[in-house]
Amino acid sequence: MAMTTDVKDELSRLVVKSVSARRAEVTSLLRFAGGLHIVGGRVVVEAELDLGSIARRLRKEIFELYGYTAVVHVLSASGIRKSTRYVLRVANDGEALARQTGLLDMRGRPVRGLPAQVVGGSIDDAEAAWRGAFLAHGSLTEPGRSSALEVSCPGPEAALALVGAARRLGVGAKAREVRGADRVVVRDGEAIGALLTRMGAQDTRLVWEERRLRREVRATANRLANFDDANLRRSARAAVAAAARVERALEILGDTVPEHLASAGKLRVEHRQASLEELGRLADPPMTKDAVAGRIRRLLSMADRKAKVDGIPDTESVVTPDLLEDA
């Protein structure tokens, strides 16, 4: 929730000069945070918000743009309500505000998505629609495998309108129904960053991007470490297997083993963890790694042929799972 609060706090302090964008934000905020109620035969506009700064911003914008007074009620945390909530209500002029914001159409019927003037407005209006929706019911998770920027929507029509607004901003968003609730989700890291900037939360975007980069670096380092560990284990097992086979080859051949092959084999047995290049330097006289590899290969081949003729276990027989497990 920390990053969600950071985004909402930054957006609630954003100064927007375009009147059209300010109206689009108010409309979106009211659409996603509340609804229309009939109280005593009158239309009441209501919005429930999770930050006092958002409630104050909305109340101020309603008064400056439309001239109507909104009342904010504070619902303290208690019982099943885990945090303080702020309920903004416009009662006396509710119907007039609903018509002017496009929440009611010309015939007085509720608009199920976002009004046409917002959906077909400017790019600034599309940004404002997202800003209002996020302030109302948005969330941003920490960067990671399941990171997401998400908005809970009052219905599928509102979700599709938000997806369309994101598309106009060059951001890929998807509408989904999760446990009966409509949501719009952005999961791509680059898209999340771009949308944060579009909405006006540039400072939070920088923090989010820094955490994302740090996590990616850490994940890459872990992958490389795991890769190195796996390579070391494979190398160790190969060395143990090679030394065991050479020992068996020397046993099979006994005194019949050629001296130059025996010396290469003994180097392999005595220096089990050494590379072929290192074995070549230890030889007397020194040899290339290809020469060492060739002699060991001929030693094993000669021993395996003799074992087959004699009907005894060859050099491969000593390479058991237990031997490799202990490597």
UniProtKB/Swiss-Prot annotation:
DNA-binding feature ranges: 275-308
InterPro entries assigned to the protein according to its UniProt record, in alphabetical order: Homing_endonucl (IPR027434), Sporu_reg_WhiA_N_dom (IPR018478), Sporulation_regulator_WhiA (IPR003802), Sporulation_regulator_WhiA_C (IPR023054), WhiA_LAGLIDADG_dom (IPR039518)
GO biological process: cell division; regulation of sporulation
Pfam families to which the protein is assigned, alphabetical: HTH_WhiA, LAGLIDADG_WhiA, WhiA_N
Keywords: Cell cycle, Cell division, DNA-binding
The keyword Metal-binding is annotated on this UniProt entry: no
A GO cellular component annotation in the UniProt record: plasma membrane
Keyword Aminoacyl-tRNA synthetase attached: no
Gene3D superfamilies per UniProt: Homing endonucleases (3.10.28.10)
GO molecular function: DNA binding
Free-text function comment from the UniProt entry: Involved in cell division and chromosome segregation.
Similarity section: Belongs to the WhiA family.
Name this polypeptide is given: Probable cell division protein WhiA
